From Swiss-Prot:
InterPro entries: LacA (IPR004783), RpiB_LacA_LacB (IPR003500), RpiB_LacA_LacB_sf (IPR036569). Its EC number is 5.3.1.26. This is Galactose-6-phosphate isomerase subunit LacA. Coiled coil: none annotated. It comes from Streptococcus pneumoniae (strain Taiwan19F-14). The gene is lacA. One of its GO terms (biological process) is D-allose catabolic process. It holds the Pfam family LacAB_rpiB. Pathway: Carbohydrate metabolism; D-galactose 6-phosphate degradation; D-tagatose 6-phosphate from D-galactose 6-phosphate: step 1/1. The keyword Transmembrane does not apply. Belongs to the LacAB/RpiB family. Heteromultimeric protein consisting of LacA and LacB.
Length: 141
């Protein structure tokens, strides 16, 4: 499993904080950030890498998280969530089988961002009654 991470200019500093944290937790990271990229391009790059392997997960950071979330929801088969708290990050994995989260550097601080990332990457999909909803999401687009 790889954690694919990317950020636009507004999210660069926080991306480095999250990246360093996850590397210290022994996760394999793929950073697709390229200088001058818009959040649209960053999100598409993260999604492309996430979709290479079923186990891969993605994190996109910009100013507010909303833009990358909108982009991610346009990608067929991508279940994503905009999160700004640890519980939502964990629950979107366990109930929605989300493969990507977005967050805003102007909304969350360093410690919260680390906890959000930790909750997301450590979350496990519960399946069961949630699979009906996930199947519905995967048919969309």
């Amino acid at each position: 499993m790889s954690i694919v991470i990317g950020a636009d200019a507004a999210g660069l500093r926080l991306k480095e904080v999250v990246k360093d944290f996850l590397e210290k937790e022994n996760f394999h990271l793929v950073d697709v950030t390229a200088e001058g990229q818009d959040f649209v391009d960053v999100t598409l790059a993260v999604a492309a890498e996430v979709n290479k392997e079923e186990q891969n997960l993605g994190i996109v950071i910009d100013a507010y998280g909303a833009g990358p979330f909108i982009v991610a929801t346009k990608i067929k088969g991508m279940v994503a969530a905009e999160v700004s708290d640890e519980r939502s990050a964990y629950m979107t994995r366990s109930h929605n089988n989300s493969r990507m989260i977005t967050m805003g550097a102007q909304l969350v601080g360093d410690e919260l961002a680390k906890n959000i990332a930790k909750g997301f990457v450590n979350g496990k999909y519960d399946g069961g009654r949630h699979q009906i909803r996930v199947d519905m999401l995967n048919k969309m687009g």
